[in-house]
Regions:
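Juxtamembrane/interface alpha-helical elements of multi-pass membrane proteins
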Residues: 1-66, 79
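Hydrophobic alpha-helical transmembrane segments
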Residues: 62-88, 93, 98
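Hydrophobic alpha-helical signal-anchor/transmembrane segments
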Residues: 1-12, 73, 89, 93-96, ...
Length: 104
């Protein structure tokens, strides 16, 4: 069930991230927006991650994304999380990478 929900929603999440971040919204704000709802299990994952970050019950965004990668069941969602993690740890061009993922 989780895998099916991830597969169904990941393309919409990718497109939303593309639009938000191309408009100048930062990664954390984009994650917060997606966590607000409308994207199934991915919204739940992002919402709980942001709650832990806000409460200080986390070691940071990078480790949180790494944890979600091990929890992800679908390849597309895992790839998106890996892209986000790489951007946080190595400061890569996330917008271009997300656009490429959205066209696959």
């Amino acid at each position: 069930m989780r895998k099916l929900d991830e597969q169904r929603e990941v393309l919409y999440v990718i497109r939303t991230l593309d639009v938000l971040m191309s408009s100048g919204v930062g990664l954390e704000a984009a994650i917060h927006t997606i966590g607000s709802g409308g994207y199934g299990i991915i919204s739940e994952d992002f919402s709980s991650m942001m709650k832990r970050l806000r409460k200080g019950n986390s070691r940071g965004l990078g480790p949180e994304l790494k944890g979600l990668m091990s929890k992800a069941d679908s390849e597309g969602y895992r790839r998106l999380l890996n892209t986000m993690y790489t951007n946080v740890t190595q400061n890569t061009d996330i917008i271009e990478t997300i656009r490429k993922q959205g066209t696959r």
